[in-house]
Amino acid sequence: MKKIFMIAMAAATLVGCGNATKFTISGSLEAEDGKLVYLATEQGRELNYIDSVAVAANAYVFEGTTEAPYSAYLLTKEGEEARPKMVAQLYVEPGQIEIKKLDEEHPTVNAVGTPLNDKKAELFVKQLELQKDKNAAEDAISKLYYESILANADNIIGWDLFKQTYYYYEPQQVIDAIAAMPAEQQEKFKSNKEAAEQALKVLPGNPYIDITEVGEGEQPKTLTPDGKVLTFKSVIENNANKYVLIDFWASWCGPCMREVPHLKAAYDKYHKKGFEIYGVSFDRDREPWLKAIDEKGLNWLHVSAVNYWDNKARHDYAVNSIPANFLVDCSTGKIIATQLRGEEVEKKMEELLK
C-alpha cells in the first residue's frame, strides 16, 4: 500500500420507526450570527442540500427525523457561488449527535453520541494512533481498515469503508470482503468483484493477455502513433525480445513522467540484450501523446486508443491507476513481475539478463 488514507464514510441501513427516529445535530462554530450551516448528502458527484440552520451565539442545532441512517456532511459557504467548506462528516441517525473535538490530543472535529458515529470516531482515533509511527503506519492502517470492513460486513460502516478503500487491497482480499456481505450488498459490489477476479488473472505466474487493435462498440482501435496495428502477441513472438514490459501510462500523469528516466536507463542498457517496452497510453488526444514520446525520447514501442480510461487493455489488465506495468517472459509467455518502480526495472533486467 503506497498511501495513508483518511476515513470518509457514507451509507444506509434500516432502523425502527416512531419516536426513535428523531435526531438532533448540535455543534459550535466561531462565526457571526446568521451564518448558515448546511446539511447535505452526496448523490454521485453532486451535493444535495437538504437543510440549513443559522449560527447563533457560535452554536447551531439541526432537528429532524429519519427512518434509516444516511451519510451526510455539514458545510458552510461564503456565498451562493462559493465552494462549500467541510465542517464535519457524519451519519444522520436517531439520537443526539454532537459535533466536537474528541479531546485535546485529537483536535479534529468528529460526530459522536450515536452508535454509528461513535464507531467511526473510534476507528478514526485508532488510525491517528497508528500514524504516530510513520514507518509502520501505512501497512498497519491498511490492516485496521480491512479488519474493520470484515467486522462490519453486515452494516453501513463496513460497506462505506469498503467503497473508500477497496483499491488498496489485494484482489483476493476484495473478493473475500464482498463474500462476507449480505447478498444485496454483494450485488451492489458486483463490478468490484469482477474487477478483482480479473486482477487475479494477471498476477505473476499467469499467461499474458494479448493487446490488439480491437475497439469495443464505438471505442477507437488501439494503434501505433503512425496508425498501424501492433499486437502485444507479435512483440512477444519477436525472436529479438526476451522480456517485454507492458507500461500503462499517459502524458498527463505526473507519476508516469517521473518514471521515464528509470525506464530510459533500463531500456538504453538492456534493449540490445533482449529487453523491450510496450507502452499503452491512456491519453485523450493524439497531440500530447505524440509530443511526450518525441520530447521525452521514449524510443520504445507505443500504442493507444487515445480514449482516456476507456480501453480494452485497461480492463483486461485490471488497471485502476497509472503508472502500472507487467513484465512478461517471452520464452514462457507468462507474467513474472508487476508494478516495478524506479530502479526496480533496471535491477530486474540486471538479474535476468546478466
Model-derived features: where do they sit?
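A short beta-strand-turn-helix
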Residues: 221-244, 269
